[in-house]
Amino acid sequence: MDEKKQQNITIKGTKDGLTLHLDDCCSFTELLQELDEKLSTHYYDGDGRSLIEVHVKVGNRYLTEVQQEEIRTLIRNKKNLVVDSIESDVITKAEAIAWKEETEIVPISKIVRSGQVLHVKGNLLLIGDVNPGGMVIAGGNIFVVGSLRGIAHAGYYGDKDAVIAASVMNPMQLRISDVTTRAPEEKEDGAETAECAYINEDNHIVVDRLQLLTHLRPNLTKLERGIV
């Protein structure tokens, strides 16, 4: 008895249109052939004029731009169908490198002096001081094992969950994402303790004791392992 032919494509109708789940193990040629057959034999009710959005999910298959365009063209040639998105669970090497740069902890040991700017894409672990007039910028969080007396800008690319922490927090200015705060007032007792800065629910930057950080940002425990 012949085995039932493996179905490489599943079509599901949703309120947003159609979702096509494409198998990620068969050959691309086989995939296109079955896609053409299935879209030719299925008739989708409509007024004959409205376009139906198609969302394509290809799983763990990497598609080149040429292959993506082949899929778009095939679907576009069917009645009233237009591709809204093609989603893959696979990322390119360039995307992986960019993600690594944005999420890794970059340890740097130096003093950032007046007029100097230190900028990293990911999380910054600075072992040293930021002098008045110096500036540190990070796409993620900023950790200063030393004195922060200059300007610090965390979440540079828009991450409002980013934080700034320093052994001695006495900055000229703090920035997190697009939120800015002026230098906090000098402590009356002159005490210099480790503190952190974060954006609260009112979209204001708050400076508080460092011990609160694990409660405010539980995910930072993963970064702590990277630091250790």
From Swiss-Prot:
Highest taxon listed in the record's lineage: Bacteria
UniProt keyword tRNA processing present: no
Pfam families: MinC_C, MinC_N_1
Swiss-Prot/TrEMBL GO biological process terms: cell morphogenesis; division septum assembly; regulation of cell septum assembly
Keywords assigned by UniProt, alphabetized: Cell cycle, Cell division, Septation
Gene3D superfamilies: 2.160.20.70, 3.30.160.540
InterPro entries: CAP/MinC_C, MinC, MinC_C_sf, MinC_N_1, Septum_form_inhib_MinC_C
Biological function: Cell division inhibitor that blocks the formation of polar Z ring septums. Rapidly oscillates between the poles of the cell to destabilize FtsZ filaments that have formed before they mature into polar Z rings. Prevents FtsZ polymerization.
Subunit structure: Interacts with MinD and FtsZ.
Family, per entry: Belongs to the MinC family.
Protein name according to UniProt: Probable septum site-determining protein MinC
